[in-house]
Structure formats: C-alpha cells, structure tokens
C-alpha cells in the first residue's frame, strides 16, 4: 500500500499519535507525517504510507494555510495558551482595523524569524524545547521565512475589563514558519505582549481541509474494503516538478538507476512510466545528463 492520506487531526493528539493510529488501522509500519502539528492545533496533516514516505520532504515544501487568533495583553513561555504567563500589559483602548490591517500587510513577504524556545528546531544537536524544559537558554538561529498573505478575517474583540484584544486572522506561509512567533511579532509592532490563542491548519502539502479524513473515516474505509478510494497517489507530492513520460527504452535505464541523456529542461524532473511517477532525476552539469535523485519505482 503506497500513497498519501490527508488526515484532519483532532486537538489533543500529537502528530506521532496520528501516525501510530494509522499504523494500527492499516496494519503497516511504514507510515510517516509531513509536518508536525502541536497537540492544541487541529487541521490538515498529510500522512505518507509505504513508498510515499520517500516523498515526505517534497510535501513539506508546499505552502501552508492557517486560520486562528492573536490575543494582545499577555505573553507566555510557549507563545501560545499552553505556556505560563510571563508578561502582562493591559490595553487602554483597542487597536483600530486600520492599524491591524496595515501591520498584517507589513508582515508579508520574505521575513527573518527567530524560532520559539518551545520548538523542535535543533541547536548543537539538541531540540530547542529540550533546552527550555531544562531551564537552559541558548542562542537561536535566525531563519528566513515567507509569508504570502496575512489578513484579518472578522472584527476583533476587545475585553476592556482584562485589557485584552483578540484579532482573527488567516495566513498563507512557506515551510518553517512558526505562526506562534508571527503572533508575538505582531504584538511587538505595538509594544504589546501577545500570544497565539487559537490555530487550525487549512492546507498543507497541496491538500485542503475539505479533502481530509478523520481517523474514524479511515477506519470505516478499511472496514468497508475501500481504502483504495481514500488513499491519494504519491504523485500529489511531486506536483511542483515538471513531469515527463518516458519510453520503454528509457524505463529500462531508469529502473536500474542509469543516467538519462536528455537536454536540460529543468534542474529536477519527475519521470512517469506506466501511469506512475517512478523517479526524480536531477541534471548534472558536469556529465551533461540527468542522474537519479530519488527512486520510487511504483508497480
């Protein structure tokens, strides 16, 4: 069984929990996910099965879409509601829609972001959250991220008694973007502490929330012997590459990992044979031909 299953992850589950559940439902060990979702976040989590585990990295290269909320007036250790409050600062009056929209627009494009301490980013061989849990501090590397669109989705709510304002947003972003940190950075524009107070992932890996199954849906599909109707071809992970259908002669070369003498069209090409993408080949400027980059060899 090879393919991708877009799962709608429930809140309260880790991404690893979902992988373990899918392994049990499908009775196979070769299962992986393409991008961690925190337990408090729900939404799209593409699950790769069988040979599709070879294309996880390419799924992660697709953009992601989230919707959620930012609350101004306090901050936490984790940049969301799961952490301990470390700073409070009441708002005397709410930000205007003009202020909100101008700042969201200013936070689009190519940005520099410092990942949160409670994250899986590795520094000196250890994950940042391991340092955080041990009470240690470490310099975090700056990373370049891309935010394609960042908009307000409904009127904000101002709680005058608490001195807090909640802003509702939708964001489209590239790989490696921490939405929690976007929330904190939004508050920083106004000299205010902030947290990400809610988040759902609407799209990831080329899949939208409307295409996703719950774990119960997957279990039902198995029981009704219709798994083939819900598992997406691994080709979905390779939509960003130029796909070339190869001849029988070329297939004999490719299936044995040989080089292809083709004029360069793209740096990386996806080779299709017998209706399936069988391999990714990369152009070698020294050899002046295409060489294997990733072998899939789907039957």
Swiss-Prot record:
GO molecular function terms listed in the Swiss-Prot or TrEMBL record: RNA binding; tRNA pseudouridine(55) synthase activity
Reactions that this protein is recorded to catalyse: uridine(55) in tRNA = pseudouridine(55) in tRNA
One Pfam family named in its UniProt record: TruB_N
Gene Ontology BP term (one): tRNA pseudouridine synthesis
Active site per the UniProt annotation: 38
Enzyme class: isomerase
Alphabetized UniProt keyword annotations: Isomerase, tRNA processing
EC number: 5.4.99.25
Function of the protein: Responsible for synthesis of pseudouridine from uracil-55 in the psi GC loop of transfer RNAs.
HAMAP family listed in its UniProt record: TruB_bact
Family according to the record: Belongs to the pseudouridine synthase TruB family. Type 1 subfamily.
Protein's UniProt name: tRNA pseudouridine synthase B
Organism in which the protein naturally occurs: Pediococcus pentosaceus (strain ATCC 25745 / CCUG 21536 / LMG 10740 / 183-1w)
Lineage: Bacteria, Bacillati, Bacillota, Bacilli, Lactobacillales
